[in-house]
Protein backbone atom coordinates (compact mmCIF):
# COMPACT_ATOMS: atom_id res chain seq x y z
CA UNK A 1 0.00 0.00 0.00
CA UNK A 2 1.38 3.38 -1.01
CA UNK A 3 2.19 6.21 1.34
CA UNK A 4 -0.67 8.65 1.85
CA UNK A 5 0.20 12.18 0.67
CA UNK A 6 -0.14 14.90 3.33
CA UNK A 7 -3.70 16.18 3.59
CA UNK A 8 -5.22 13.18 1.80
CA UNK A 9 -7.77 11.02 3.56
CA UNK A 10 -10.13 11.68 6.45
CA UNK A 11 -9.03 13.92 9.30
CA UNK A 12 -10.22 11.41 11.90
CA UNK A 13 -10.31 7.60 11.94
CA UNK A 14 -13.63 6.45 10.52
CA UNK A 15 -16.04 3.64 11.28
CA UNK A 16 -18.18 3.18 8.17
CA UNK A 17 -21.57 1.57 8.80
CA UNK A 18 -22.70 0.37 5.38
CA UNK A 19 -26.45 -0.26 5.45
CA UNK A 20 -27.62 -2.49 2.61
CA UNK A 21 -24.14 -3.97 2.39
CA UNK A 22 -25.17 -7.01 0.34
CA UNK A 23 -27.38 -5.08 -2.09
CA UNK A 24 -26.79 -4.31 -5.75
CA UNK A 25 -25.28 -0.82 -5.33
CA UNK A 26 -22.94 -2.02 -2.62
CA UNK A 27 -21.75 -4.93 -4.76
CA UNK A 28 -21.31 -2.98 -7.98
CA UNK A 29 -20.01 0.35 -6.70
CA UNK A 30 -19.46 0.79 -2.97
CA UNK A 31 -17.38 -2.23 -2.00
CA UNK A 32 -15.18 -2.00 -5.12
CA UNK A 33 -14.77 1.74 -4.49
CA UNK A 34 -13.87 1.26 -0.84
CA UNK A 35 -11.39 -1.44 -1.81
CA UNK A 36 -9.67 0.87 -4.29
CA UNK A 37 -9.48 3.62 -1.66
CA UNK A 38 -7.97 1.14 0.77
CA UNK A 39 -5.52 -0.17 -1.83
CA UNK A 40 -4.38 3.37 -2.65
CA UNK A 41 -3.90 4.22 1.02
CA UNK A 42 -6.59 6.93 1.03
CA UNK A 43 -8.58 5.61 4.02
CA UNK A 44 -6.06 4.77 6.71
CA UNK A 45 -7.58 4.18 10.12
CA UNK A 46 -10.89 2.94 8.76
CA UNK A 47 -13.21 0.08 9.72
CA UNK A 48 -16.22 -1.01 7.66
CA UNK A 49 -19.26 -2.66 9.24
CA UNK A 50 -21.74 -4.14 6.79
CA UNK A 51 -25.41 -4.34 7.79
CA UNK A 52 -28.17 -6.05 5.82
CA UNK A 53 -31.01 -8.53 6.10
CA UNK A 54 -28.84 -11.42 4.90
CA UNK A 55 -28.04 -13.92 7.65
CA UNK A 56 -24.25 -13.83 7.39
CA UNK A 57 -21.36 -13.69 9.80
CA UNK A 58 -18.19 -11.67 9.23
CA UNK A 59 -16.44 -14.49 7.38
CA UNK A 60 -19.46 -14.90 5.13
CA UNK A 61 -19.50 -11.17 4.41
CA UNK A 62 -15.81 -11.22 3.57
CA UNK A 63 -16.40 -14.12 1.19
CA UNK A 64 -19.22 -12.19 -0.48
CA UNK A 65 -17.03 -9.09 -0.70
CA UNK A 66 -14.20 -11.03 -2.37
CA UNK A 67 -16.60 -12.55 -4.91
CA UNK A 68 -17.96 -9.07 -5.55
CA UNK A 69 -14.51 -7.59 -6.13
CA UNK A 70 -13.53 -10.43 -8.46
CA UNK A 71 -16.62 -9.69 -10.53
CA UNK A 72 -16.93 -5.90 -10.46
CA UNK A 73 -13.55 -4.37 -9.64
CA UNK A 74 -12.05 -2.50 -12.59
CA UNK A 75 -8.55 -3.47 -11.46
CA UNK A 76 -6.95 -6.73 -10.47
CA UNK A 77 -7.17 -7.87 -6.86
CA UNK A 78 -3.75 -8.37 -5.31
CA UNK A 79 -3.74 -10.81 -2.43
CA UNK A 80 -1.82 -8.47 -0.14
CA UNK A 81 -4.26 -5.65 -0.84
CA UNK A 82 -7.22 -7.98 -0.34
CA UNK A 83 -5.88 -9.27 2.98
CA UNK A 84 -5.52 -5.69 4.26
CA UNK A 85 -9.06 -4.83 3.12
CA UNK A 86 -10.62 -8.00 4.52
CA UNK A 87 -9.08 -7.22 7.88
CA UNK A 88 -11.14 -4.03 8.24
CA UNK A 89 -14.47 -5.68 7.30
CA UNK A 90 -17.06 -6.70 9.88
CA UNK A 91 -20.73 -7.63 9.58
CA UNK A 92 -23.88 -7.35 11.66
CA UNK A 93 -27.12 -8.92 10.39
CA UNK A 94 -30.11 -6.62 10.70
CA UNK A 95 -31.92 -9.15 12.85
CA UNK A 96 -29.18 -8.91 15.50
CA UNK A 97 -30.57 -5.53 16.54
CA UNK A 98 -29.31 -2.16 17.70
CA UNK A 99 -27.34 -3.45 20.69
CA UNK A 100 -25.20 -5.74 18.57
CA UNK A 101 -24.55 -2.97 16.07
CA UNK A 102 -23.48 -0.60 18.86
CA UNK A 103 -21.09 -3.17 20.30
CA UNK A 104 -19.58 -3.77 16.87
CA UNK A 105 -19.02 -0.04 16.32
CA UNK A 106 -17.53 0.38 19.79
CA UNK A 107 -15.19 -2.56 19.17
CA UNK A 108 -14.06 -0.97 15.90
CA UNK A 109 -13.51 2.39 17.61
CA UNK A 110 -11.44 0.75 20.33
CA UNK A 111 -9.29 -0.89 17.66
CA UNK A 112 -8.76 2.46 15.95
CA UNK A 113 -7.95 4.27 19.18
CA UNK A 114 -8.05 8.00 19.68
CA UNK A 115 -10.79 10.32 18.48
CA UNK A 116 -12.83 8.65 15.75
CA UNK A 117 -15.92 9.48 13.69
CA UNK A 118 -18.79 7.46 12.24
CA UNK A 119 -20.04 7.49 8.66
CA UNK A 120 -23.42 5.85 8.05
CA UNK A 121 -23.97 5.08 4.37
CA UNK A 122 -27.58 4.13 3.58
CA UNK A 123 -27.61 2.10 0.38
CA UNK A 124 -31.23 1.07 0.91
CA UNK A 125 -34.53 1.59 -0.97
CA UNK A 126 -36.80 4.49 0.05
CA UNK A 127 -39.17 2.26 2.02
CA UNK A 128 -36.30 1.08 4.22
CA UNK A 129 -34.58 4.43 4.81
CA UNK A 130 -36.54 5.49 7.87
CA UNK A 131 -36.19 2.14 9.64
CA UNK A 132 -32.43 2.27 9.01
CA UNK A 133 -32.25 5.76 10.52
CA UNK A 134 -34.29 4.64 13.52
CA UNK A 135 -31.93 1.70 14.01
CA UNK A 136 -29.02 4.12 14.21
CA UNK A 137 -30.88 6.16 16.83
CA UNK A 138 -31.70 3.06 18.88
CA UNK A 139 -28.04 2.06 18.70
CA UNK A 140 -27.05 5.54 19.96
CA UNK A 141 -24.84 6.10 16.92
CA UNK A 142 -25.92 9.64 16.09
CA UNK A 143 -23.16 11.56 17.88
CA UNK A 144 -19.86 12.11 16.06
CA UNK A 145 -21.47 10.89 12.86
CA UNK A 146 -22.41 11.79 9.31
CA UNK A 147 -25.16 10.07 7.34
CA UNK A 148 -25.21 9.58 3.57
CA UNK A 149 -28.64 9.12 1.99
CA UNK A 150 -28.56 7.54 -1.47
CA UNK A 151 -31.12 8.41 -4.10
CA UNK A 152 -34.02 8.12 -4.54
CA UNK A 153 -34.87 10.22 -1.48
CA UNK A 154 -38.49 9.15 -1.06
CA UNK A 155 -40.73 8.14 -3.95
CA UNK A 156 -42.55 11.46 -4.48
CA UNK A 157 -42.66 14.98 -3.04
CA UNK A 158 -44.84 14.08 -0.06
CA UNK A 159 -42.72 11.07 0.97
CA UNK A 160 -39.50 13.05 0.49
CA UNK A 161 -40.76 15.90 2.68
CA UNK A 162 -41.93 13.41 5.32
CA UNK A 163 -38.62 11.52 5.28
CA UNK A 164 -36.68 14.77 5.54
CA UNK A 165 -38.73 15.93 8.54
CA UNK A 166 -38.26 12.63 10.37
CA UNK A 167 -34.58 12.60 9.50
CA UNK A 168 -34.20 16.03 11.11
CA UNK A 169 -35.70 14.65 14.32
CA UNK A 170 -32.59 12.51 14.68
CA UNK A 171 -29.77 14.16 12.71
CA UNK A 172 -28.95 17.83 12.24
CA UNK A 173 -28.71 19.20 8.72
CA UNK A 174 -24.93 19.52 8.82
CA UNK A 175 -24.71 15.76 9.44
CA UNK A 176 -26.77 14.82 6.38
CA UNK A 177 -25.51 14.23 2.84
CA UNK A 178 -28.10 13.46 0.15
CA UNK A 179 -26.31 12.12 -2.89
CA UNK A 180 -26.67 10.55 -6.29
CA UNK A 181 -23.71 8.27 -6.98
CA UNK A 182 -24.15 8.86 -10.74
CA UNK A 183 -22.70 12.35 -10.32
CA UNK A 184 -19.49 10.81 -9.02
CA UNK A 185 -18.71 9.39 -12.45
CA UNK A 186 -15.81 11.13 -14.15
CA UNK A 187 -17.77 12.35 -17.23
CA UNK A 188 -20.40 13.91 -14.97
CA UNK A 189 -17.71 15.50 -12.82
CA UNK A 190 -16.09 17.00 -15.90
CA UNK A 191 -19.22 18.66 -17.33
CA UNK A 192 -18.91 21.84 -15.27
CA UNK A 193 -15.18 22.18 -15.92
CA UNK A 194 -15.75 21.60 -19.64
CA UNK A 195 -18.49 24.22 -19.74
CA UNK A 196 -17.22 27.03 -17.51
CA UNK A 197 -13.49 26.48 -17.78
CA UNK A 198 -13.43 26.46 -21.56
CA UNK A 199 -13.18 29.85 -23.24
CA UNK A 200 -14.25 28.39 -26.57
CA UNK A 201 -17.53 26.82 -25.48
CA UNK A 202 -18.72 28.89 -22.51
CA UNK A 203 -19.74 32.01 -24.52
CA UNK A 204 -21.90 29.96 -26.90
CA UNK A 205 -23.35 27.54 -24.32
CA UNK A 206 -26.89 28.93 -24.52
CA UNK A 207 -30.20 28.61 -26.36
CA UNK A 208 -29.02 30.77 -29.25
CA UNK A 209 -26.44 28.22 -30.32
CA UNK A 210 -27.63 24.88 -28.90
CA UNK A 211 -30.45 23.22 -30.80
CA UNK A 212 -31.24 20.47 -28.29
CA UNK A 213 -29.75 18.32 -25.55
CA UNK A 214 -29.81 14.54 -25.80
CA UNK A 215 -28.72 12.29 -22.93
CA UNK A 216 -28.27 8.62 -23.79
CA UNK A 217 -28.01 5.81 -21.27
CA UNK A 218 -26.73 2.83 -23.26
CA UNK A 219 -26.99 0.37 -20.38
CA UNK A 220 -27.60 -3.33 -20.85
CA UNK A 221 -27.96 -4.09 -17.15
CA UNK A 222 -31.07 -6.09 -16.25
CA UNK A 223 -32.92 -6.39 -12.96
CA UNK A 224 -30.53 -8.97 -11.48
CA UNK A 225 -31.06 -8.74 -7.70
CA UNK A 226 -33.09 -5.52 -7.90
CA UNK A 227 -36.57 -6.88 -8.59
CA UNK A 228 -37.84 -5.97 -5.12
CA UNK A 229 -36.48 -2.44 -5.41
CA UNK A 230 -37.94 -1.90 -8.88
CA UNK A 231 -41.31 -3.26 -7.85
CA UNK A 232 -41.72 -0.42 -5.37
CA UNK A 233 -39.69 2.31 -7.08
CA UNK A 234 -39.69 1.70 -10.82
CA UNK A 235 -37.23 2.61 -13.54
CA UNK A 236 -38.54 6.17 -13.97
CA UNK A 237 -37.84 7.15 -10.36
CA UNK A 238 -34.61 5.19 -10.26
CA UNK A 239 -33.10 6.58 -13.44
CA UNK A 240 -34.94 9.53 -15.01
CA UNK A 241 -35.81 11.90 -12.14
CA UNK A 242 -32.52 11.22 -10.37
CA UNK A 243 -29.55 10.31 -12.58
CA UNK A 244 -30.73 11.96 -15.78
CA UNK A 245 -32.36 15.10 -14.39
CA UNK A 246 -29.34 15.82 -12.19
CA UNK A 247 -27.03 15.33 -15.17
CA UNK A 248 -29.25 17.70 -17.16
CA UNK A 249 -28.96 20.34 -14.42
CA UNK A 250 -25.17 20.28 -14.89
CA UNK A 251 -25.64 20.98 -18.58
Regions found by a protein language model. Name each.
Residues 1-60:
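N-terminal low-complexity, Ser/Thr- and acidic-residue-enriched intrinsically disordered segments
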Residues 249-251:
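Conserved small/polar residues in nucleotide/adenosyl-binding loops
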Residues 39-90:
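Glycine-rich phosphate-binding loop and adjoining beta1-alpha1-beta2 segment
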Residues 228-247:
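Substrate-binding/catalytic subdomain of NAD(P)-dependent oxidoreductase enzymes
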Residues 99-101, 106, 111-146, 153-157, ...:
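Beta-loop-alpha module in the N-terminal Rossmann-like domain of NAD(P)-dependent dehydrogenases
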Residues 148, 153-220:
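A contiguous active-site-proximal alpha/beta segment in oxidoreductase catalytic domains
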Residues 90-97:
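Short acidic-hydrophobic, aromatic-tinged amphipathic segments that line or gate anion-handling sites
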Residues 3, 55-57, 65-75, 103, ...:
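Catalytic cores of eukaryotic secretory-pathway lumenal/extracellular enzymes that build
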Amino acid sequence: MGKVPPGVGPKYPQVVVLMGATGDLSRRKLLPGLFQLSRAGFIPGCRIIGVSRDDLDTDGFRTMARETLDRFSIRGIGETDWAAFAEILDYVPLAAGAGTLLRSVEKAEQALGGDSRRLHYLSVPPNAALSAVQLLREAELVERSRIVMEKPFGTDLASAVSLNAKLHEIFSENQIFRIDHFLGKEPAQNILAFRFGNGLFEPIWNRNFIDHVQIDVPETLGLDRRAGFYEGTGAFRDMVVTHLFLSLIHI
